[in-house]
UniProtKB/Swiss-Prot annotation:
Sample GO molecular function, one term: precorrin-4 C11-methyltransferase activity
Lineage: Bacteria, Pseudomonadati, Pseudomonadota, Alphaproteobacteria, Rhodobacterales
Gene name linked to the record: cobM
UniProt keyword annotations, A-Z: Cobalamin biosynthesis, Methyltransferase, S-adenosyl-L-methionine, Transferase
Keyword Transferase: yes
KW Methyltransferase (keyword) present: yes
Protein name: Precorrin-4 C(11)-methyltransferase
Species: Rhodobacter capsulatus (strain ATCC BAA-309 / NBRC 16581 / SB1003)
Amino acid sequence: MTVHFIGAGPGAADLITIRGRDLIASCPVCLYAGSLVPEALLAHCPPGAKIVNTAPMSLDAIIDTIAEAHAAGQDVARLHSGDLSIWSAMGEQLRRLRALNIPYDVTPGVPSFAAAAATLGAELTLPGVAQSVILTRTSGRASAMPAGETLENFARTGAVLAIHLSVHVLDEVVQKLVPHYGEDCPVAIVWRASWPDQRVVRATLATLQTSLGAELERTALILVGRSLATEDFDESRLYAGDYDRRYRPLGTHPRFPEGSE
């Protein structure tokens, strides 16, 4: 018996990985975070599967349900939204399972920041503009930010910021970023990226407040950075005609001759 932790993706049911879909179809028990995982994914569960919405459950109750399935020799599909490597609360579940000697594995999912960038049609790391993306959030009731992990510190790098779980303190976010990025820095807020009812707001740090209109909910992602709206960037050397690379050796003495490892 194995517990399969599966990243369900950002929202659209067809953005789950093939592996994730197949694991769901193979498990007689499915636990899903109903507040963020689309119910359409449950159609992949086998007939007669036990399907449990964990949104109203405590960690103890979730682990008890998994342990019950383990005792019955049943595999479990554990669905979380987005990708499990960030803000999934997977770590505490894995720690409990290790203590109980219950085996598990992890299948990654499409993260929300990637879905938001796709919605915008944006490459976040444009040569000469930005080569780093910082995934962060502000302090909330569930988790405080460690000392040093502040918006001001991250903003000093000039990297693209993907700020999660923070649209409810948008005034504070803008106030902290303007001194480092400037009022003309592009911003995009993407609410429920890839869902049928997704919403997108494009603005600058100076105009963001007046561009919002109706209040967006907590699931909105804030993207900040120059690469969101510029045509002034370098072309990658990767595809330059004079660039000697392993799969396209050039000249009489290429850096990577054909057949070399």
